[in-house]
Curated annotation (Swiss-Prot):
Coiled coil: none annotated. The keyword Nucleotide-binding applies. Keywords: ATP-binding, Isoprene biosynthesis, Kinase, Nucleotide-binding, Transferase. It comes from the Bacteria. The active site is at K8, D134. It comes from Porphyromonas gingivalis (strain ATCC 33277 / DSM 20709 / CIP 103683 / JCM 12257 / NCTC 11834 / 2561). Gene3D superfamilies: 3.30.230.10, GHMP kinase, C-terminal domain (3.30.70.890). GO terms for biological process: isopentenyl diphosphate biosynthetic process, methylerythritol 4-phosphate pathway; terpenoid biosynthetic process. Its EC number is 2.7.1.148. One of its GO terms (molecular function) is ATP binding. It is an enzyme of class 2 (transferase). This is 4-diphosphocytidyl-2-C-methyl-D-erythritol kinase. Belongs to the GHMP kinase family. IspE subfamily. The gene is ispE.
Length: 274
């Protein structure tokens, strides 16, 4: 049985407060996009699970892979046979696209459906939350306003980017998320929340729909700012970094012709948003 875990982008990301526990509260819109990995399982005649990862390399030991953490979380509640798991990575890691979190949540859904486990989406989302703050998003997989640590979701009725073209570029830059939060120059509520701005026409988002990480990370990594400007030069209605990076995305009315010389060393992907 095979599924295709998809990525997400952040539309705006406001870091609104630093908490007493050292973490930060955020306000951001999560939007699913059709950049996908492939995840397949089969029952195996053995005493333990086996995970094989292909495609884009990921910097994680097998036992640290979120797919394995998802299986272990389900095994604490249910008994099911050992599995052979094949994961083909197309979503780059360390990009702000939620690839690992998506893999974990799709694994939860896949095992549930494969073995007809008696657990609904709400219970599955609760398990997903124990794996990562944004993992529950991929259980419902619909556009939401994410608040608190990014795990409290408010639906966005009638909000859709369907029909727009999207381009993603990710340079070979690694950004440590904890360091990115530590380096923030702005922490606090802004005048308008992301879920209000996204209902405006997309070509009015520029300058309004802000990712707070850009202010601190762009001076440190000028290449990120250059790629964002390249997306605008290529005709983007809106362009931004997703999460704490290092992937950037642009939204276009038509299929864009990107500056190939500017992205020769980048991961790049384009599609129409369904």
């Amino acid at each position: 049985m095979i599924v295709f875990p998809n990525a997400k982008i952040n539309l705006g990301l406001q870091v609104v407060a630093k908490r007493a526990d050292g973490y930060h509260n955020i306000e951001t819109v999560f939007y699913p996009i059709p950049l996908t990995d492939a995840l397949e399982i089969e029952v195996r005649e053995d005493t333990c699970d086996r995970l094989s990862v292909h495609g884009i390399p990921i910097d994680a030991a097998t036992e640290d892979n979120l797919v394995m953490k998802a299986i272990l979380a389900l095994r604490r509640k249910f008994d099911f046979p050992p599995l052979t798991i094949e994961l083909i990575k197309h979503i780059p890691s360390g990009a702000g696209l939620g690839g690992g979190s998506s893999n974990a949540s799709f694994m939860l859904k896949l095992v549930r459906d494969y073995f007809s486990l008696p657990i609904d989406d709400k219970e599955l989302a609760a398990i997903a939350l124990t794996i990562g703050a944004d993992c529950p998003f991929f259980v419902g997989n619909r556009p939401v306003l994410a608040t608190d640590l990014g795990q409290v979701f408010t639906p966005l009725p009638n909000f859709s980017l369907s029909g727009l073209h999207i381009a993603i570029v990710k340079p070979p830059i690694h950004i440590n998320t904890a360091a990115a939060y530590k380096g923030l120059k702005h922490v606090g509520k802004r005048e308008t929340m992301p879920d209000e701005i996204v209902y405006m026409p997309v070509d009015e988002w520029r300058g309004k729909l802000v990712n707070d990480f850009e202010e601190s990370l762009f001076p440190e990594h000028p290449r990120l700012a250059e790629l964002k400007e390249m997306l605008y030069r290529s005709g983007a209605l809106y362009a931004a970094m997703s999460g704490s990076g290092s992937a950037l995305f642009g939204l276009f009315r038509e299929k864009p012709q990107l500056d190939k010389a500017a992205i020769t060393d980048c991961f790049r992907w384009q599609s129409i948003i369904p």
